[in-house]
């Protein structure tokens, strides 16, 4: 197992896979792709057709401010809608005692785009020129617009949270962290 080494080339030599990385070459009989947000690219290096592509979606969180933690004493999740690929915002109690609310789901402009300002032009180009993303947007136009609105407006994000906790107010939440979801999308 080799971690923290970006694979730049893969090839099969006999019954072994050779992975070339900045840390050197590594050989093994089996290849397990654990490249997360880059797994489609690593699969391409291994000779697989890129029929499915990873499109990065940033999930932004808010957290309850200190004086509002009593509003949520347990995990609170919405009933999933099987027609949509994302669960929707929810409340999660954290092990250290805090409570986070979220996430939304918006296109990240970089595969490691944890902030709204993170932009990687090749990653962004890869996403916006992919027909699978546009098929997704056409299938879920309302949800796409609402998720973007929630990203741009704390008030709109709070309104989504009020479906689960009606008494929550904009002043009860403050910006939290973010994650990036590796959303696998088919071309068609």
What are these regions (language model features)?
Residues 5, 104, 176-178:
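Short, well-ordered beta-to-alpha junction loops that form the rim of enzyme active sites
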Residues 10-120:
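Flavin-dependent oxidoreductases
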Residues 110-144:
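Extended, charge-rich helix/loop segments that form flexible
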Residues 1-7:
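A conserved beta-strand/loop element that lines the FAD pocket in flavoprotein oxidoreductases
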Residues 35, 84, 126, 150-158:
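Generic structural signal for well-ordered, non-membrane alpha-helical segments
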Residues 53-59, 63, 67, 135-188:
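Flavin (FAD/FMN) cofactor-binding core of flavoprotein oxidoreductases
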């Amino acid at each position: 197992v080799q971690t923290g080494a970006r694979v730049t080339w893969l090839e099969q030599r006999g019954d072994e896979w050779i992975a070339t990385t900045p840390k050197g070459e590594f050989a093994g009989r089996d290849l397990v792709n654990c490249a997360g947000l880059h797994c489609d690219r690593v699969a391409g290096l291994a000779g697989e057709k890129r029929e499915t592509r990873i499109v990065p979606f940033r999930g932004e969180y808010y957290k309850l401010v200190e004086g509002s933690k009593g509003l949520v004493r347990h995990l609170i999740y919405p009933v999933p809608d099987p027609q949509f690929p994302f669960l929707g915002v929810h409340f999660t109690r954290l092990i250290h005692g805090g409570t986070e609310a979220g996430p939304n789901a918006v296109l990240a402009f970089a595969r490691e785009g944890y902030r709204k300002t993170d932009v990687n032009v090749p990653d962004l180009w890869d996403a916006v020129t992919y027909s699978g993303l546009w098929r997704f947007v056409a299938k879920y136009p309302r949800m796409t617009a609402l998720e973007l609105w929630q990203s741009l407006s704390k008030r709109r994000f709070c309104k989504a949270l009020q479906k689960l906790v009606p008494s929550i107010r904009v002043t009860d939440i403050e910006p939290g962290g973010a994650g990036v979801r590796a959303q696998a999308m088919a071309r068609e």
